Amino acid sequence: MHERRTPVRTLETMNDNASSDIQGIVTDLLNGRPYSHRQDVDSSVAAVITVQEDLRFFDSTFEAVLRQRILPGTIVVADCARRVSQPMQLTFDVIPSPAGVITTMPENKTVRVILVGADHAVSFADAVRSAIAQFDIGAEVRALWMLHDDSRPADDSCLEAMLDAWKNTPMASLLGAKQLDWPGRGLHDVGMYADGHKVVSLVVDGEPDQEQYDGRSDVFAVSLAGALVPLATLKAWDGIDPWFGTFGESRDFCRRICLGGGRVVVVPQARIAHARARFEGLRLRNGHAVDDDAEPADSYLAVREAQLKYAYTDVHRTWWPLLWLWSIVLALGLGVRCLAAKQPYRACCELTLPWRALPGLRGAWRARARIRRQGKVSAKALPTLQAGPPPKRQVGGPLGY
């Protein structure tokens, strides 16, 4: 049985400037949502979707969230492009149909959809933090389902698979999803592993998903795109550090969890189709779309800076002077290699990286102090979370994006 429900505006707080494309997309998708008794609502979960200036992927992601068999009780849309000046709330009802013979009328369950601005966020996780700080998220919420606007659930059971895994692995501190390309056929990663002072994937980026990695569970790191993050984890590990940026904050957060005695679990049955718009050059650093007829933007510098931040904070601070001197030698070698490959921009990036690292030492000092304070074991004491021998290693894409 299907029917249509019109969302009810419950917060008259948006001014004329807030009547934006993003509001129109949300309202249209809610108005056009086919109502189904096959859906249920879990009020313990709040989904947070961060949205950039580029809206090409958002409607597909929001629609995929609305199709979930288990809906989050709260769906937060965090706009990072100054289109939402004040919070706005919409609601819609779901009447789940229990299995078996129905003897009583099922009770309505309400889903809140909240639009908020996150204009000054410096990373994905910072936008999520800013969004949920602007309203009362509710005492019943126990976890956040974090999504980029270009990371859509690849099927209707994505959140359900996450919740089942959380129920069966209650000690998991963070649960991540299998990362696929936007069509949902090629793999990006299925969790990541520690390898010296970096993290690597044991997946060849783009290889067909044939469920060959679906036996994985405990890993060293997962992408935050599509991750289920318990609020207790955020509190226990002092939140996610935005200093690492969108390309690096997931690596640091997962590292602190693993070294602090927590568990990072990948749920291969939960599938996220991730366009990785900024990494793939489809989106500029400021969130604007790259024109279809223009060359893709090169994300090389942002990715390398994230890798460098991770490397510095992964060693004792007394090693930093030697690491910096070594980075100069490495920059010369990598710069020459990039020039030989006719990549002058990347060569310039490599040559400037040692100097770009210096202003960030204060942030690195704080990050390293947090790791030492929270850490209980070393990465070497976690052999099952280490990468295999070199022939089996494949460097994955940027974690958290």
Residue ranges and their predicted role:
Residues 2-66:
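N-proximal low-complexity "stem/linker" segments adjacent to membrane-targeting elements
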Residues 66-117, 136:
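Acidic donor-binding segment of Leloir-type glycosyltransferases
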Residues 118-137:
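Glycine-rich, basic loop-to-helix element that forms the pyrophosphate-binding segment
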Residues 140-152:
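Short beta-strand-to-loop acidic/aromatic patch adjacent to the donor-nucleotide binding site
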Residues 152-194:
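Conserved donor NDP-sugar-binding/catalytic core segment of glycosyltransferases
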Residues 207-229, 290-292:
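A recurrent flexible, glycine/aromatic-enriched loop bordering the glycosyltransferase active site
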Residues 220-238, 243-271:
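A short, conserved alpha-helix in the catalytic core of glycosyltransferases
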Residues 259-362:
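Active-site-adjacent helix/loop segment of glycosyltransferases
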